[in-house]
Amino acid sequence: MSKLTTGSFSIEDLESVQITINNIVGAAKEAAEKAEEELGPMGPTPFPTAATVRDWSFTLFDRYEPVYTPMCDQCCYCTFGPCNLEGNRRGACGLDMKGQAAREFFLRCITGCACHSAHGRHLLDHIISIFGEDMPINMGASNVIAPNIQLITGRQPKTLGDLKPIMEYVEEELGQLLATVHAGQEGAAIDYDNKAMLAGILDHVGMEVSDIAQVTALGFPKSDPEAPLVEVGMGTLDASKPVIIAIGHNVAGVTYIMDYMEDNNLTDKMEIGGLCCTAFDMTRYKREDRKPPYAKIVGTISKELKVVRSGIPDVIVIDEQCVRADLVEEGKKLKIPVIASNEKVMYGLPDRTNDDVDAIIEDIKTGKIPGCVMLDYEKLGELVPRLAMEMAPLREGISAIPSDEEMASLVAKCVACGECALACPEELDIPDAIQAAKEGDFTALDFLHDLCVGCRRCEQVCNKEIPILSVIDKAAQKAIAEEKGLVRAGRGQVSDAEIRAEGLNLVMGTTPGVIAIIGCANYPAGSKDVYRIAEEFLNRNYIVAVSGCSAMDIGMYKDADGKTLYERFPGRFERGNILNTGSCVSNSHISGTCHKVAAIFAGRNLSGNLAEIADYTLNRVGAVGLAWGAYSQKAAAIGTGCNMYGIPAVLGPHSGKYRRALIAKTYDENKWKVYDSRNGSELDIPPSPEFLITTAETWQEACVLLAKNCIRPSDNNMGRSIKLTHWIELSEKYLGVLPEDWWKFVRHEADLPLSRREELLKKLETEHGWEIDWKKKKIISGPKIKFDVSSQPTNLKRLCKEA
């Protein structure tokens, strides 16, 4: 082949020369026209930045004002400090307390977004390296396959390679956002809040990339309401076999371990279980054919230390996110090797990626090293099962759980100083439980097992060096052995067909709402609360969507017939169903479902059209999120993204530590007005949702908030009556009172709960001065909100026809 050389030429003296680049221009134009034909016209904010989302953020903040809850009065960001910001003081840089609290919250959101998005980048690059960029995306029977991506970027990816520019956009924006955290940058709290909202929606894009990649390539269930049931709980593990425990959120490396087990007929000779979201994705791997998984879900982050100290694992393999920082130290005590398979968590372990597997096993067996980093997944797949089989006989009988004699000795050391109770984030009465144990009564310690979040803070302040967590688990051995439940493997997206079938009911209110129970396991009073909440709303015909750690814990409890909620209720997107979308990154499918309602049911243009779709959701789709045990920065990002999308969220009491809420003033009538897009006239609406993000103190209070904030301006009479019925009943059942503002939601007598119509009409007349025609049992005058089922509520003036 001849070698090409560079050169130049001039057309200065040439006549009648035409240079055409029509193939390039024409191709680009053709692609743009095809995209518009498929996806509709491009909206106003494709690939948004902090500047282009600001108008919508500020529209939300005008009603839902930021409320800041700082953890301390100081700022320690730079060497000018620390600066005391109490009493409206400003720091050396000029930032005040509001700005600092907003910056802290924003920092948590971009941290969470970076975590999910880096997960997505790693997973996408890994999967493309195996299957190629041209692998078609397959999410099941849907045309709207990437609603978050389409909404935010205006693009609809067709192949894995199409996801790469999406990730590049997220990464670029994260860099721009992170820069504003630096001292001497943003100075206004409200603009930090706007940037947090952008970080939230970027998080949903990053999560969607992650799950699209793994659902497409790894044989996960695809929009499958009958995904297989999976065993969950510590009691599901057969400790007589070698046991592998995987911890984290990125399943890429674990799939190689499972492949090795299958290829070598080891699936019935050893156990593999997981903690946190890797556990969910292990049970989804190669399960689109609905075969029962052999992998087991052991539990949530709160179970990590409990599982390690049980001595059950023979090898721990970790990837990224929600893994304890002390696993190597805890593992050393029990001769449990730790294998790190992702460079985000390397624990100071030696990198043995390039070494021979036999040599690594020998070094770990002999105690030369406590584990290693292994980034070659082919070797990882071989190393971990072989190591587990080698370590199991060497570790037989090793556990941190005390014997009966050791237990008596340990509890006898307690002097009831109360330091452990003061350190406990759940304020558990550990001293009294240990005092009872001294007398031989272990009931109170056993009771603490489910309430304990496994943080070990109590042990670190104990002057007698009692391993309190191990003492609690010793008392709960029977409960732990019986800890066996069932959870449905993650089904993936909600299909377009399900949206078409349920969209009208949801928008009109005859399906009372969607309750999305997501997030971590930092519960204020044990894991059963999320089960109670889910059961309450399923019995009331709400759609309950779940994911992550909450989905696991919901599956741990059974009714009198021994059935879990996943066995009692179907898994479709329709009223009275519970659908588990999957791991943490599958939360994008829950927000994406709301976008799909607007796009498929209402025919709204999705592409690059953030404000219009979020406005539709806020005014018409009765969806509320619940992150009852939220602890992480990822949870903050997920919730904030939902807020930007018009979806309110209730958090548990610990979440005040996030430092910011978005709460409306329900008494300010000027805040509860929207436009009727038919003609631009002003409409009064009820004060709901009354917040975008807030906290509740108890699960009972949370139930009432969830029901109330499913009410939407678009509800028809039947829908409003159904929603008022549930809200009023829950308030009376759990709080013992009729809601004080129930009357504000009545537009017409047909809105009233049918069984209590006469009673409530009397209250409207005697307590609120409304005029009632008692012969016809009709409201003559009183309501400020007029009922018009054909009204089109919107917060956006530009959507009105006159505009």
From Swiss-Prot:
Enzyme class, spelled out: oxidoreductase
Residues noted as binding [4Fe-4S] cluster 2 in the record, renumbered to the chain: 75, 78, 83, 93
Catalyzed chemical reaction(s): CO + 2 oxidized [2Fe-2S]-[ferredoxin] + H2O = 2 reduced [2Fe-2S]-[ferredoxin] + CO2 + 2 H(+)
Keyword Metal-binding: yes
Binding site for CO: 116
Pathway(s): One-carbon metabolism; methanogenesis from acetate
Cofactor details (free text): Binds 7 [4Fe-4S] clusters per heterotetramer. Binds 2 [Ni-4Fe-4S] clusters per heterotetramer.
Ligand binding ([4Fe-4S] cluster 3): 414, 417, 420, 462
Keywords noted in UniProt: 4Fe-4S, Iron, Iron-sulfur, Metal-binding, Methanogenesis, Nickel, Oxidoreductase, Repeat
Disulfide bond sites: none
Cofactor(s) named in the record: [4Fe-4S] cluster; [Ni-4Fe-4S] cluster
Binding residue positions for [4Fe-4S] cluster 1: 72, 76
Binding site for [4Fe-4S] cluster 4: 424, 452, 455, 458
Molecular function, one GO term: nickel cation binding
Entry EC number(s): 1.2.7.4
Coiled coil segments of this chain: none
Gene3D superfamilies given in the database record: 3.30.70.20, 3.40.50.2030, Carbon monoxide dehydrogenase alpha subunit. Chain M, domain 1
Domain 4Fe-4S ferredoxin-type positions: 405-433, 443-472
Residues bound to [Ni-4Fe-4S] cluster: 249, 277, 322, 520, 549, 584
Domain notes from UniProt: Cluster B is an all-cysteinyl-liganded 4Fe-4S cluster; cluster C is a mixed Ni-Fe-S cluster which is the active site of CO oxidation. Cluster D is also an all-cysteinyl-liganded 4Fe-4S cluster that bridges the two subunits of the CODH dimer. Contains two additional 4Fe-4S clusters, dubbed E and F, that probably transport electrons from ferredoxin to the B cluster.
Recorded family membership: Belongs to the Ni-containing carbon monoxide dehydrogenase family.
Biological function: Part of the ACDS complex that catalyzes the reversible cleavage of acetyl-CoA, allowing growth on acetate as sole source of carbon and energy. The alpha-epsilon subcomponent functions as a carbon monoxide dehydrogenase.
Assembly: Heterotetramer of two alpha and two epsilon subunits. The ACDS complex is made up of alpha, epsilon, beta, gamma and delta subunits with a probable stoichiometry of (alpha(2)epsilon(2))(4)-beta(8)-(gamma(1)delta(1))(8).
Protein name per UniProt: Acetyl-CoA decarbonylase/synthase complex subunit alpha 2
